[in-house]
Each structure stands twice: as C-alpha cells, then as structure tokens.
Amino acid sequence: MAILGLGSDIVEIDRIAAVISRTGDRLARRVLSDNEWRQYQSHQQPVRFLAKRFAVKEAASKAFGTGIRGGLAFNQFEVYNDELGKPGLRFLEHAQEMAQKLGVAHVHVTLADERHYACATVIIES
C-alpha cells in the first residue's frame, strides 16, 4: 500500500448555519448524497451533521488532488459509519471513476467537531 493522497479541511459551523438560514436546504441538497440527505432531515443537530460532511468531502477532494471541479461534486462522496461508529467514505459516480483510475484501494477518514469547528482528514491508499 502506498499513500496516493492526503487532504484535510476545517469548517466553521456558524458559517454553515448562516448559509442554511439564508438559502434553506440548497447547500445540503448540493453537498449530501441521497442517503445522507435522509439522515440530515431527521438528525438532532442537522447543521453540525452538514458541517462534518462538508469537511470530509472537501478533504477527500483535496486527497484526490483536484478539489471540487472537473465533474467532481460533493454529493459524489458519501460518508457513512460502520457498526462501531467509525467514519468511512464511499465514492459515487465520477468520484468512483476517479478512484478507480487512481487505483484507490483503501480510504481512511477521521473527523472531529467542537463547539465552533468541524475538521476532517482523508487519506487514500493504493
């Protein structure tokens, strides 16, 4: 296994809250996959949920070395948790094609949040 990419991101949770108050669910619909959208709608802390997902997806796009552009979109990354709560990442659509081209075999995700910030790190390996 070799590290193909590393990305990290930090999000100010109040900025996400401000966007939601200005634009409603537009940001959430753009960022979240269908599965994540369903979770978001019933989550006890939807702003915090969205901020953490946003941070992971930004970190993942940085690990790819591209950022969000060239056909890559936030909702093509899907954050999930295993039975122990450990976060993982699925690639959908164009992100899945890019992962295959890069030879991604393993993905490591860590995320944390405190009062004001959510942060995430993503490592992709061959």
Swiss-Prot record:
Entry EC number(s): 2.7.8.7
Protein's cellular compartments: Cytoplasm
Keyword terms: Cytoplasm, Fatty acid biosynthesis, Fatty acid metabolism, Lipid biosynthesis, Lipid metabolism, Magnesium, Metal-binding, Transferase
Chemical reaction(s) catalysed: apo-[ACP] + CoA = holo-[ACP] + adenosine 3',5'-bisphosphate + H(+)
Keyword Cytoplasm attached: yes
BP GO annotations: fatty acid biosynthetic process
UniProt-listed Pfam families: ACPS
Stored InterPro entries: 4-PPantetheinyl_Trfase_dom, 4-PPantetheinyl_Trfase_dom_sf, ACPS, Ppantetheine-prot_Trfase_dom
A GO CC term attached to the entry: cytoplasm
GO MF annotation: an example: magnesium ion binding
Record: residues binding Mg(2+): D9, E58
Cofactor dependence: Mg(2+)
Cited function: Transfers the 4'-phosphopantetheine moiety from coenzyme A to a Ser of acyl-carrier-protein.
Similarity comment text for this entry: Belongs to the P-Pant transferase superfamily. AcpS family.
The name this protein goes by in its record: Holo-[acyl-carrier-protein] synthase
